[in-house]
Amino acid sequence: MIFNNTKENDYKIYLRGDLVMKKLMTGNEAIARGAYEAGVKYASAYPGTPSTEILENIALYKDDIVAEWAPNEKVALESAAGGAFAGARTLASMKHVGLNVAADPLFTVAYTGINGGFVVITADEPGMHSSQNEQDNRNYAKSAKVPLLEPSTSQEAKDMMKMAYEISENFNTLVIMRLTTRLCHSKGLVECEDRNEVGIKPYEKVVKRVTVPANARLLRVDVEEREKKLYKFSNETEVNYMEINEGAKVGVISSGMCFNFAKEVFNNNASYLKLGFTNPMPDEKIKEFASKVEKIYIVEENDKFIEEHVKS
C-alpha cells in the first residue's frame, strides 16, 4: 500500500497496483457525501453540535440537492417527510435532543410509510460536550418500530447512508441513522463514488396517510408486519457480522464507535459481534455468536440498549 497526498484531504492510494482515490473526511462530511451519492434531492436540518456540519456539507452539493435550515427540528422532519411523500429521496438531520421536538411527526410517519427514501439522522452526545443531557435515541427507533443503523467509521457512515435509502424504499419506512460525537468529528479515509441519480417517483394520493383513527388502526397492522420482515433482514445483513479469533474465550458485542474502542482494548484476545443494524436486533446471529465463546462483554455508550435485549 502506497499513499500519495495530492492536495489537502485528497489521497491517491495504490492497492495491489490499482489506483483508488480517497478523501479524509469527518463522519459528518461522510454522511453528506453518502447523501449525495445516494441521489438525495432534499435535506432539511436544525443546527446543533455535533450534527451541524452535516447540512453545511450537503449544501456544497447545491447543484444536486436542495438544502435548507428549518426553524426547528419538527419542521425539518416534516419538510423532509413531505419531500419523501412526493417521491424524492430526502433526509432530516438534528442533534439528539432535537428528536424530542420532532417526535410527533416521527411516530406518525413511522405508521404512514413513505414513497421516496427517507432518512432521519440523530447525532447523540455521550459525554455531553455541548448538550444538556445524554439521552440515547436508539430508544426512539425501538419505540417507533423503525430501522436503526449505527456506523463506526467515516467510510461506514457514507456507505450506510446509501444502504439506508435502499432499506427505506424496500420496506416502506423511514430509517434512523444514529451517530455520536466522536464519529461526527473524527476523520477517516473515505472512498468516494459517483452520484446515483435516482428519479423522483410518481406521486399518488394515498388516503391512508391521513392518520385519523380509522386509518391509524389499520396502519398499526402494517407496522407489525414490516417489523417481522426487518427482523429477518437484521439476521441476514452484512453490516451485522462476526469476527472470530481462534482461541479467544471472550466475546464482545458492540456497535458504533464503541466497536472501535473495544477492538483497541481487546485486540485479538476476543471475538466480536459487530452490530451495524440495531433495530430490530439480530437474535439468531446473537445466539450463534454466544455459542462460540465462554463469556460475553457488551460495550456501548449511554443506555443498556444492546445489553437489555441480549439478557432478555
Could you describe each region identified by the protein language model?
Residues I13-S154, R182, N245-E246, N269-Y272, ...:
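Thiamine diphosphate
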Residues F3-K7, Y11-N28, P151-S312:
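Flexible, low-complexity linker and terminal segments
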